[in-house]
């Protein structure tokens, strides 16, 4: 398939250069967006009297026939085409004749590509946003069921204070809600400016109606500077950054799932459908999904770094380096979509094991802070209460006891402020339900968080 750009060249391009230059293997995914942009561009050309009404009708008929063949599976994309834009235009011309040759009037591949990427990423972002909403809903549903399941909360991976399973899951729901907001913000900025009509970099002499094409394509307005319109990929970087942040949260959640389903924790049981076995060890039930999410997170980070490094030294306006944007951003999109598609049903079918959580919470003196708070509320300065409780914990460790196993007389050896009500104060359920500060682990707080988060998804 010949190139559209062979103007002054007197020699055919070396086949090795053609192979090196080709992007059809990864930009073919933009074919629908390319056709969408061409339909609007040609309609505008007709409205402005730049091409005839008959040409517009022929172009639209041809583009719709290509689209129909694409949807039916009858369209064969030529792997030897330089890119998807060349393929569409040359296929169109083969079907409708000279009208197809007029489609590119007033347009450059530079603004065409910048438009197609935006349209493609808009659709991808909207799909991912829907996936994140589904995942948040699953987390909320599991949190609602586990709002009363007491478990250890950790710092430094050491048992720290009692929380609930629902409280822990809602932490991730809030994180993902911010990820959703970041994707929405990035998409809103991407949709603010339409590059179509920027030409190669300096606009065009044709009387284009850029406001019409921007509106028809769902943009707020045309970009205000034609050079900027074709020469930046900050929208790719911003969207990839939002996706990388989301992957980071999925990776942290995955790490917790990996720990929780191990025999050392056994806080949850994953459904067999979302685990794998071993080729040699018949007892194994491996959380491969979550391990792969951890691994794939680095892949998305790498894509973000590719985009940043690619753009850092490019002079205005368009440079061929920018062709590398597509593989990076599309791979980031595909990776996040795949992770979300898999992790959501895995979490929906996950079974909590509250008895094991409670047993773990009963060890490790995670009610020590509540013991210190008890003394503080009785009038002892907090620092003194902290030291007193630390001394008690050290003694209990030596004697193989828990705080709850101390008699009242033993408590009073450390302070006369201790009374019978200390046992209620350091009870694990009381420890959780007593933390009534906003956003805390009480059952009422978790249920409110569930309602608040679901309300933000509506």
Regions found by a protein language model. Give the residues of each.
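A generic structural-conservation signal
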Residues: 54-55, 223, 384, 405
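Residues in soluble alpha-helical coiled-coils and helical-bundle/repeat scaffolds
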Residues: 47-50, 130, 244, 248, ...
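Short runs of predominantly hydrophobic/aromatic residues within well-ordered alpha helices
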Residues: 38, 85, 89, 236-239, ...
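Glycine-rich cofactor/substrate-binding loops
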Residues: 1-37, 98-99, 281-458
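Charged, flexible cofactor/metal-binding loops and thiol motifs
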Residues: 117, 122-124, 129, 144, ...
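Generic, well-ordered alpha-helical scaffold segments in large soluble proteins
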Residues: 41, 62-69, 91, 95, ...
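A helix-coil-helix interface module used to build multimeric assemblies
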Residues: 1-189, 193, 199, 203, ...
